[in-house]
Amino acid sequence: MTIKNFTFFSPNSTEFPVGSNNDGKLYMMLTGMDYRTIRRKDWSSPLNTALNVQYTNTSIIAGGRYFELLNETVALKGNAVNYIHANIDLTRTANPVSLSAETSNNSNGVDINNGSGVLKVCFDIVTTSGTGVTSTKPTVQTSTLDSISVNDMTVSGSIDVPVQTLTVEAGNGLDLQLTKKNNDLVIVRFFGSVSNIQKGWNMSGTWVDRPFRPAVVQSLVGHFAGRDTSFHIDINPNGSITWWGESIDNTPIATRGNGSYFIK
């Protein structure tokens, strides 16, 4: 058993006993990177000249390895989508990093800090015509973290969350279309035509599946189509559904509307 490669302890106060592999792991752990993601900063904008892109002053971290592109030029293919890759080969001690323009994203996720091989990471996507560059799109810089706690957050794009759907035949002609977002919010659409139900009855059909059940009773309001009247139902923590609309005889009345509730 061995514990080594401390980043906080220098026995003689003159050396830093951490190798480049360990330093690479440190970068990746601090930023939530994996071997298919990058960090990139253009200190000055790349230049596009004919079928060439020149990275005038760009910093990149890939596989935890930091390097700089200073007036580095990549030849592009015409009438194509060019995926610009950084290739890190630690066996090439004089020039361990090279750039290549390829016709697809060939990022390979090779673990160069614990094993061997050449790491390929795409960091730019450049589209060309027959004579020059028509568009550029840097690769998204992604972090993977277990939990984030922030005091304030501004989002300019979209937030993607897991989505599940469920259709519940609640009984007595009432149907519910449930859409759950990120195990937090459930959006409910009412449809179907209700009959043979009394106020306060538990509905006779299917209960709500466990993943969609609220922690406390949730009351949702819908309306009867073509009428000026509404109804509400309770979705109970055990999944049962209680009708709190008017009592309805055997003549069906169409329902419409939407509601929502938080699971927790």
Swiss-Prot record:
Quote the cellular component terms of the Gene Ontology held in the record: virus tail, baseplate
Q: CDD domains given for it?
A: RBP-H
Q: Where is this region: Host receptor binding?
A: 164-264
* Keyword Protein biosynthesis in annotation: no
Primary place of residence? virion
A Pfam family cross-referenced in the UniProt record is Caudo_bapla_RBP
Q: Which InterPro entries match?
A: Adenovirus_pIV-like_att (IPR008982), Caudo_bapla_N (IPR048780), Caudo_bapla_RBP (IPR015027), Caudo_bapla_RBP_neck (IPR048779)
Task: Tell me the Gene Ontology biological-process terms attached to this UniProt entry.
Answer: cell adhesion; entry receptor-mediated virion attachment to host cell; symbiont entry into host cell
For this UniProt record, give its keywords in alphabetical order, as a comma-separated list.
Host-virus interaction, Viral attachment to host cell, Viral attachment to host entry receptor, Viral baseplate protein, Viral tail protein, Virion, Virus entry into host cell
Where is the protein localized? Virion
Notes concerning its domains: The C-terminus is involved in host receptor binding. Host-recognition domains point upwards, towards the capsid.
Q: Which family does it belong to?
A: Belongs to the skunalikevirus receptor binding protein family.
Under what name is this protein listed? Receptor binding protein
Q: Which organism is it from?
A: Lactococcus phage SK1 (Lactococcus lactis bacteriophage SK1)
